[in-house]
Amino acid sequence: MAMNDPDRLRRRSPAILAGTVPSYSERLSHEPRWALAEASAFFEGKSKVQDTLRRITGRLDEMGIPYAVSGGLALFVHGYRRFTEDVDLLVTPEGLRAIHEKLEGLGYVAPFKGSRNLKDTESGIKVEFLVTGQFPGDGKPKPVAFPDPAGVAVEKDGIKYLGLPTLVELKLASGMTNPGRLRDLADVMELIRALHLSKEFGRQLAPFVRDKFLELWRMQEESGFTDNGDK
């Protein structure tokens, strides 16, 4: 094969580029004025994070790969607005393989060899993948697993997100089983507060997480939360 074969060069490019893509997270840490401007843009829907989201979901739609946005961007679209510095996507194992085969080296690089995640070479933002059939939190088998995105996604402005019940279930299961993921339980509490979720909302959740939802709901009630809405 010729040394200048374009396909060969393309396949080598992720390893070459991985160390040269500026890190969005590092820039946030080291450039406070830029970080403040970026945070302001985020809450207007105009940040590099949202640009990265639109870019990757547009590519997945073009390739026909099912996905659902999770993490902080899903929280944002459902009504709890907090800043996030990465893009989290739920995909199937087949979808993940296709993503790496078709996108790695073409605007995206792996942060390190063998990583299932990618970094957008334009923004430096990490795109993290959750995979259908795997388990949230400690990663061990449990009654709540990452579902097929095609069955749980809701669309807003042309982008598919985890539906609210699924988002809450996964965050509860994560926070319940991994002490390092207590932020997920805090996110659920903020959703309860921001959306005025009723305790009846818990009925549509998996039994494995239902009691934890009710516990968090009661904590909000005791701290002054009032149940004045049915979501």
What positions do the PLM features span?
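Compositionally biased terminal segments of proteins
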Residues: A2-K231
